[in-house]
Amino acid sequence: MVKPLPRLRLQGFNNLTKALSFNIYDVCYARTEEERQRYIEYIDEQYDADRLTQILTDVAEIIGANILNIARQDYDPQGASVTILISEEPVIDKKQAGKELISDAVVAHMDKSHITVHTYPETHPQEGIATFRADIDVATCGVISPLKALNYLIESLESDIVIMDYRVRGFTRDVKGKKHYIDHKINSIQHFLAKNVKSRYEMFDVNVYQENIFHTKMHLKDFDLDQYLFEERAKNLSFKERMKIETLLKREIEELFHGRNLSE
């Protein structure tokens, strides 16, 4: 739960911008070119624009935002994108329901409060590795906090590796004229994760407190080969095959987690 600082009396609107960025990876091994293609098709179907729209709509509800507009697109040969514009307050007076309106709130929030997701399925040309990356951004202005959606997003996607960045920008001014550059307590993104999530992942932080920048990356603690095989079971493989595939997968996970290629 996001713990606010003692309530401030503000001069006008809360102008703080809070941005949460996710990169979520699913890693898989598919033995043949045909299996790798079926993996891409499976991911493309599982995370098409309709499914992603539902996930982001749920995020908007969780953080207490109002949806202004939704744009979504499936791509050929694969991938999808969804963008939802949101606001802190309802933008249409109930008395005006059914009438065509151009709300000032829409213009005011279009470049500040939004939720976006883009998907990137891909495969290794020779080694059988296939990955899926979901790139998610939740940016809000005002008192709405994107941190409330952390656990839901991790549980909604096949999250072998999660890389998160959170930053607060701008300032809000109280009635005495003093500027405040953050309006809630935070030492680490980890503090906003549920216990059952933290128990499953190894986590690592890089935080720049004086700049209100917080970075956490994590990967699953337990390695179960069956969870990474596509259309195959570990028991059907020879010991040598299992060791080879396990080595490839662990290397891929480590490289994605650290964001760099390891030396041979």
Swiss-Prot record:
Keyword presence, Lyase: yes
GO molecular function per UniProt: adenosylmethionine decarboxylase activity
SUPFAM superfamilies found in the cross-reference section: S-adenosylmethionine decarboxylase
Record PTM: Is synthesized initially as an inactive proenzyme. Formation of the active enzyme involves a self-maturation process in which the active site pyruvoyl group is generated from an internal serine residue via an autocatalytic post-translational modification. Two non-identical subunits are generated from the proenzyme in this reaction, and the pyruvate is formed at the N-terminus of the alpha chain, which is derived from the carboxyl end of the proenzyme.
GO biological process: spermidine biosynthetic process
Family from the record: Belongs to the prokaryotic AdoMetDC family. Type 2 subfamily.
Assembly mode: Heterooctamer of four alpha and four beta chains arranged as a tetramer of alpha/beta heterodimers.
Catalytic residues as annotated in Swiss-Prot or TrEMBL: 113, 118, 141
Cofactor stoichiometry and binding remark: Binds 1 pyruvoyl group covalently per subunit.
Pathway connected to this protein: Amine and polyamine biosynthesis; S-adenosylmethioninamine biosynthesis; S-adenosylmethioninamine from S-adenosyl-L-methionine: step 1/1
EC number per UniProt: 4.1.1.50
Organism phylogeny: Bacteria, Pseudomonadati, Pseudomonadota, Gammaproteobacteria, Lysobacterales
Any one Gene Ontology cellular component term annotated for this protein: cytosol
Name of the encoding gene: speD
Protein's recorded name: S-adenosylmethionine decarboxylase proenzyme
Originating species: Xanthomonas campestris pv. campestris (strain ATCC 33913 / DSM 3586 / NCPPB 528 / LMG 568 / P 25)
